[in-house]
Amino acid sequence: MPHIEDMTMLIYKDFTFEAAHFLPSAPPGHPNSRIHGHSFHVRVTIEGKPDPKTGLVVHFDDLAAAIADAREGLDHQFLNEIDGIGAPTLENIAIWLWSRLLPQVPALSEVHISRPSCHEGCIYRGK
């Protein structure tokens, strides 16, 4: 059996937030041109090798603490007014989350954001 320190693992933490937005590029009269809201689901994935002593890549409490600040900046907000997002598309929100999380989560591997009720999502891997 391989040693745990030789294994690379992907671990993740999910969170949700509620927010409103409109898409400035949507044609007049299109539903996305008007303010509307969504329930968003986010999965933050980290890649790394487990510590041989603890067996952990990262403690989930530490990951949750890093995520809390980013979530707070989005939950029950009007996304068009958040500095750094630009047009509030799934793509731009994923990039915004990445830039907020990376300083606290250097092993960040992936940000997956979706609107489950719309069956739409975006995965950003920092490239």
Describe the function of each predicted region:
Residues P2-K127:
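Charge-rich, low-complexity N-terminal segments
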